[in-house]
Amino acid sequence: MFNVILFTDAPYPHHKIRGYGVHRIASQIRANGYTCLVIDFSSALTFDKYKEIIDASVGPETLMVGYSTTWLRYRWPELPGEFTNQIPGHHIGEQHELSHTKDEQHDWRKDNMVVKFGKNEVEEFLQYPKTINPKLKIVLGGAKADFYMDLQNVDHVIFGIAETMTIDLLDKLSGKSKRIFNKFIDHDRKAHADTWDFRESSTRYTELDFIQPQETLTLEVGRGCRFKCAFCNFPLIGQKNVNDYLKYPSKIRDELLENYERWGTTKYFIVDDTFNDSTEKLEMMVKVMRDLPFKIKFWCYTRIDLLAAHPEQIELLKELGVAETFFGLETFNDQSSKTIGKGMPSSRRKDTLYRAKEVWGDRVWIEGGFMIGLPYETQASWRNTVDWLKQADCPLDISTCYPVNIVKKSERNQWFPTSWFDNNYETFGYEFPHDGIEGMLAWEKNDGTDINSFIQAQEIADATTKELASYQRQRRGDFYTSSFNHPLLFDREKTLDMSQTDYNKLVNSIDFNQLFFDHTNRDYFIPLLKLLKGRNV
């Protein structure tokens, strides 16, 4: 039996990827002397299987059962039982929603935990642990906690980065502390308390995670960002000294080596807000990797203006093993770029994209993200961007575009992470003239441009996506599909060598919903329950 049991889902719909945040919290919990079990893949977890896990893991010593909201559906607390298709700017949320809707055609998907959370029909899940131990606490956390703060049968909701707050709560529940907590816990949203040091931290997995060699795990090298883009609502932006949140090289090396020796892991999502925020950081990582007996491949967020200012970073990233990267380009309208804190001229950014593609080659996927509806952006300037994206030599393999994400000021914003734009949108003529839930998202503006509303921006984004479809390269061997223990998909290098036609035939022949369910059961839930039940005999 365990002091803490935590549930999470896959970051990408129906692919065998672990929800990193819960494993990070679990590592911190164990480092503070508590036992913790993480349960992944909640979207393949029916209530019957959930009961088996709770029966085998909850006992008198259990202090809390927690549920991460990060990869759940977006929903409005004000509309119980209903959920949104998309929050502006969050394309993963849209994919989750569409995928889960299709899944409800399958009997095994109608009653899984993620669907039940989204429909506010999760009472039996939340109530069941207390039938075994009435004293334990039911706790929510994660990036969408504010979308689920209305749920009944929840004792506490933790907002923000939770390493320190989780330990504070556990110390209270275990009797180590007399601190009093309200239902909503947010006293250290940025995990700045001096009771821990991120630089000394590591995320460790256990035999109860049943990790397989083909899986892609997540790595944090640093935390936070020294930039402060106007649209960004991440909690640790604008940090002056990023080295205060950069892991020590020995910690990174040990984490990579342990994952390789125990699980055979060589693929990673590096989730730093800006992986290339300094050349020194990349040089440190090169030294770490040269000291390891294996190479890694990884996906990361990068800034193109930093590659332009420090071109040596292009070669450093290649040596490190970059395989996929995402650039938040936002716009090629130079006046718009300056407004949001990305003022480098578009011509220089484009030149750097060409240089990166030349050095990295076609086996590295470059994705660019764009926002529609920024100040000064017009339909004509956006058309210039689309025409460039359609050029045969465009260095971007994939381009995604979404309406500008601004949230109307309201009382609930105290729980909702907000950006500079969210707090100052009137400065550029944005307004929210409509009431109700939909009105919280549907901005309008009259600034002399001809993109004047969220609805119009969404229509332009949809039309652009369709127009660019035949110009985009389809990912082959991406880190999501190659995390399956599938005879063809698991070998990323082989799928990269396939022709586009052969790869299309392969992926079109696979029911990924069924594959996800079958593999998580065969390779995870069945052996996990066997091991848990064996421990209790």
Where are these regions (language model features)?
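Radical SAM enzyme core and accessory elements
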Residues: 2-7, 30-31, 51, 57-62, ...
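A structural preference for short, hydrophobic beta-strand core positions in alpha/beta folds
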Residues: 38-40, 140, 300, 368, ...
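Structural recognition of alpha->loop->beta junctions
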Residues: 149-168, 316-324, 386-401
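Short, electropositive alpha-helical surface patch
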Residues: 283-290, 377-396
